[in-house]
Amino acid sequence: MEKWWFNSMLSNEELEHRCGLSKSMNSLGRAIGNTSGSEDLIINDTDKNIHSWSDSGSYSCNNVDDLFGIRDIWSFVSDDTFLVRDSNGDSYSVYFDIENQIFQIDNDSSFLSELESSFSNYLNFSYLNSGSKSDNRYYDRYMYDIKYSWNNHINSCIDSYLHSEISIESYISSSSDNYGDSYISSFICNESVSVSDNGSSSIRTSGNGSDFNIRGRSNDFDINQKYRHLWVQCENCYGLNYKKFFRSKMNICEQCGYHLKMSSSDRIELSIDPGTWDPMDEDMVSIDPIEFHSEEEPYRDRIDSYQRKTGLTEAVQTGIGQLNGIPIAIGVMDFQFMGGSMGSVVGEKITRLIEYATNGSLPIIMVCASGGARMQEGSLSLMQMAKISSASYNYQSNKKLFYVSILTSPTTGGVTASFGMLGDIIIAEPNAYIAFAGKRVIEQTLNKTVPDGSQAAEYSFHKGLFDSIVPRNPLKGVLSELFQLHGFFPLNQN
């Protein structure tokens, strides 16, 4: 696997002209000097207009050992110009123009290689010895691994460019005793970047076998909103996850491993074998039984709004399918639909699912994600707790069938007080928020402070409330083993 480095500190007048950019050079502070210490510009022909990438013979930059301060360099660096170095040491200058769909590469590196070397030495000396990056936010763009083909490299370059637009925190690491062998890689962060109260962010640096922290200010960071639709923000570490790959990673944060919310459709795709899903009662919708009206928005209008937003008819999807070849009945709640609240339609769909599984002797999986009973339906929503529990009693106690309850974040209120806690096996996701009454309700009712973490899945697990905490990655395999232990086997086995 080849590794490519994208360094941002490589644009100067030569690149400004060669890339067809017109950025003024009048804002230059102290110039890139030579070994004699001269203050004259080594590259100072600002009147020339060079539009070809291959036209660089009139420029030279020899014996460069003195660079701008980081902030000075950023006063004239082009955001669209990068240096790419492959594993063979060959350097390329890369130009991006997203709006005009231009992607150009030039491998004439007579100037770039020397500038890159000087910049690398400067970074190693400045950051690893002075221990400060307070004047720098952008000294590196992104490190990307390239596989298979040059086409993939181009795609990776574009992805890296998008990463760099919102990158503010970088990590310097070294696996050797020689700082010159260090490589620099950037990680994508969001507005907060796990910033402490004083507004500083940390950089973890490794060198000579020792670790230490460098603190840098990030108060002046203003994230680029242009590519916000490309990223999913983690609720825990505030890191950004590339949306293109986020679904394939089961909505798990790449930075901290936190399990973010999943839609019911994604959970069905995660659990059910392809081509085996058969939904039930899709056309069942609420008719506003108590004619609940709100000053902000009528109940029926709110239902219609969530139906358009999510593509669902209600806050739960029920149906039958196969899990590793084992026929099952499954119900999956969707928190995106009115907070996964349980109204009369949700209760009826779950009850019908349990009755169908009872008649067909199928195991049941219920994936819970709910804020509780739906207040817009009053006591009718509370009645669903008793109705579902009654059907579950017949399924479990009389028919001796197997019910697995999976609690995800959040699971609260009437769902927790009914079928959420009635499973023969109760599984929770890591860090899931699980409670009967929410923290705010308890504090307002009892006038007492609820300790942080007291309603997290890990705390409840240690108190014996669940059977297991299972991450999403192995969940399907765990469920398959549980079913086989209870006598439910794949259809293709004798």
Curated annotation (Swiss-Prot):
One of its GO terms (biological process) is fatty acid biosynthetic process. Pathway: Lipid metabolism; malonyl-CoA biosynthesis; malonyl-CoA from acetyl-CoA: step 1/1. A zinc finger (C4-type) spans 234-256. It comes from Drimys granadensis. It catalyses: N(6)-carboxybiotinyl-L-lysyl-[protein] + acetyl-CoA = N(6)-biotinyl-L-lysyl-[protein] + malonyl-CoA. Zn(2+) binds at residues 234, 237, 253, 256. It is found in: Plastid, Chloroplast stroma. This is Acetyl-coenzyme A carboxylase carboxyl transferase subunit beta, chloroplastic. HAMAP family: AcetylCoA_CT_beta. Belongs to the AccD/PCCB family. Pfam families: Carboxyl_trans. It comes from the Eukaryota. Its main location: plastid. Its cofactor is Zn(2+).
